[in-house]
Amino acid sequence: MRPTGPDEEAGGDPVRNRDVWLIVPCFNEGTVIEDVLRNAGETFPNIVAVDDGSADDSAAAIHRAGAHLVRHPVNLGQGAAIQTGVEYARNQPGARYFVTFDADGQHQVKDVLTMVGRLRSEPVDIVVGTRFGRPRAEDDQVPLIKRLVLRTVVMLSPRTRRLGLTDAHNGLRVFNRRVAEGLNLRMNGMSHASEFVELMDSNGWRVAEEPVDILYTEYSMSKGQSLLNGINILSDGIVGRRLP
């Protein structure tokens, strides 16, 4: 028997994780996505990246990284990209667990390992990451505007409170086939996260949260943490009636 390293003992063996598929929505992430996919692929060999109508070389970067590539001819939004990726992944032989994973380097493989481990060992259908799951100094690293928006979403959503979620718009989620087969996101924009919450509640999916560390870099901040982005999250949910 060959010796195992600490990563494998923690569930990081790529062979063991062949039943896990990472779904990575991508829009104009050509400068970073290759490194993100290569890093994740060392632990999770099955990755599908959905190029959501990018105008840069994202598709070429995805090819170089060795991930599966699905392309939208035009930009449809993150919700549509996730739905496309889940539909692709759930049709692959042996797929049991599914992960929504950001293309910009914010999410960490170590958190995915922990969340997958919980699905394997606990009676839950979906584990959602939270930036607010434990008292820690790192919470201060969440941009102020982002914190205000996320807290407002929880306050306005009875379903979110009923499910005990503290960070409904966290893009790091791990779920089983029951969720993957029942997922039918109709909101293409940022409000798909609130729609996820609605589906959790209406389908009776067993939900858990896991504290995660989000890496806020200068690049990721420029892509998605602005005041306009926060306003869009709220307006999409309210107009689309996705803050039930």
Regions found by a protein language model. Give the residues of each.
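Conserved sequence signature across two-component system core domains
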Residues: 26, 50-52, 72
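A conserved acidic beta->alpha catalytic loop
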Residues: 51-60, 105
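Acceptor/aglycone-binding surface of glycosyltransferases and processive sugar-polymer synthases
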Residues: 72-88, 97, 109-190, 217-234
